[in-house]
Amino acid sequence: MSEPEVTYSTVRLHKSSGLQKLVRHEETQGPREVGNRKCSAPWQLIVKALGILCFLLLVTVAVLAVKIFQYNQHKQEINETLNHHHNCSNMQRAFNLKEEMLTNKSIDCRPSNETLEYIKREQDRWDSKTKTVLDSSRDTGRGVKYWFCYSTKCYYFIMNKTTWSGCKANCQHYSVPILKIEDEDELKFLQRHVIPENYWIGLSYDKKKKEWAWIDNGPSKLDMKIRKMNFKSRGCVFLSKARIEDIDCNIPYYCICGKKLDKFPD
């Protein structure tokens, strides 16, 4: 009997493509992870270094900002000081200029002051001479008690009591009109110097014009004051040391005549 024939075969198992990829991935993954672990250490150092640099930069920027702020403040203080000094200098120059102008003005006014003093001396001399001349003729026997002059005007006081019309006639007898008071200064002057009596003056009520009028029908700086007195249109006005007032023209009072001088005595 013959021996059976034995046949040998080699069985080869082929890995599937998915399994091959998995094996290959595992084979390659191992070395990469090792490489990553080796490379991560230098990067961490770099990141830390960059963080430190950023921190230093922030600190530097903060310090610079503080320095710039302090510099600006210091600069502003210096500018304010300079401006204050400049303003003080301007004020000092202006003060010096005004002082110089006042000095020059006072120098310029000296001739005017000297002129005014001269005029006053001459006026006083003229007043004294005029009063002396007129006083020497005061006793005329016609009722003139006294007279005197002030500035460019002479005043005649007739001390015979009469009506306003009689006063006007007596003044005309001396070729001097009944007194017209030019302004409030003259009024105050007369009230200081007259004897305490009542005196007719040249102001009466014009019934035709229905207004108060002076003897020459001219204006006076006293008109406004008279209008404020609200006279009652009773006829005529008299003067006393205390007031001027309207009253019946037929009441007898003393009389004041007044005239401006045309020529100064030498």
Curated annotation (Swiss-Prot):
Changing K161R: No effect on MHC class I peptide tetramer binding. Residues 147-151 are annotated as: Involved in dimerization. Glycans are attached at N79, N87, N104, N113, N160. The chain crosses the membrane at residues 49-69. Changing I226T: Greatly reduces MHC class I peptide tetramer binding. Changing E197G: Increases stability and improves binding to MHC I class ligand. Changing V133I: In strain: NZB. GO terms for biological process: cell adhesion. GO terms for cellular component: plasma membrane. It is found in: Membrane. It is a single-pass type II membrane protein. Changing K232T: In strain: NZB. Residues 150-258 form the C-type lectin domain. Changing T115L: In strain: C57BL/6, C57BL/6 X BALB/c and NZB; requires 2 nucleotide substitutions. Changing I251Q: No effect on MHC class I peptide tetramer binding. Keywords: Cell adhesion, Disulfide bond, Glycoprotein, Lectin, Membrane, Receptor, Signal-anchor, Transmembrane, Transmembrane helix. GO terms for molecular function: carbohydrate binding. Changing K129E: In strain: C57BL/6, C57BL/6 X BALB/c and NZB. Changing Y174S: No effect on MHC class I binding. Homodimer; disulfide-linked. Receptor on natural killer (NK) cells for class I MHC. This is Killer cell lectin-like receptor 3. The gene is Klra3.
